[in-house]
Amino acid sequence: MAPSISPLIRCLIFRAPNGRFFDLPAIINTARKKRALGDIPAQIHFQDNPAATGTADLLLASGLLQYLDTPFTDFIKALPEPPMHILLNKVAMRDGDALVTLEQISPNRVPYRIRNRQNFEAELTHSGYVIRDTWLIPELAHTITTHPWLGASESRGYLMERA
């Protein structure tokens, strides 16, 4: 059964009037099939390679970073041009060491990265972005049931602007 697109697309790169989506290859393949069937507008393009997304003023990533297998700053460097603004939502964080655990998605388990908040924010600043706003999403905090001594993670959002 093909996955549903709307909750799975995690990174949207806008370029008016068209939109460009980046996601994992399996999700992108499903999205392309849905576009071919007319379920998704033809103006929306799907990429599994950041370098092929084109330039954008705004990068919106919601729930992407915990599944991204490279540092976010490397993802930004892979784009044709760094966007002026970045809006991140649902970024899994903790105050301790960064770690990777497994998340159950349907019958599968997938790697799930939880970043160290201080290090992540320092990387963003070092890569040339100013954090203009940040917010907590308390309902997405969770504790790894097999490792409760690690404490709960938190979910954050960020609005950033290139310096």
Stretch-by-stretch model annotation:
Residues 139-163:
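Core SAM-dependent methyltransferase catalytic element
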Residues 110-136:
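Short alpha-helix
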Residues 59-60:
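A conserved beta-strand element that flanks and buttresses the S-adenosyl-L-methionine
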Residues 67-82:
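A short, conserved alpha-helix within the catalytic core of class I
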Residues 82-102:
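Conserved beta-strand signature within the Rossmann-like core of class I S-adenosyl-L-methionine
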Residues 5, 73-77, 117, 121:
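Short amphipathic alpha-helical segments and helix-helix/interface helices
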Residues 1-51:
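Class I SAM-dependent methyltransferase SAM/SAH-binding core
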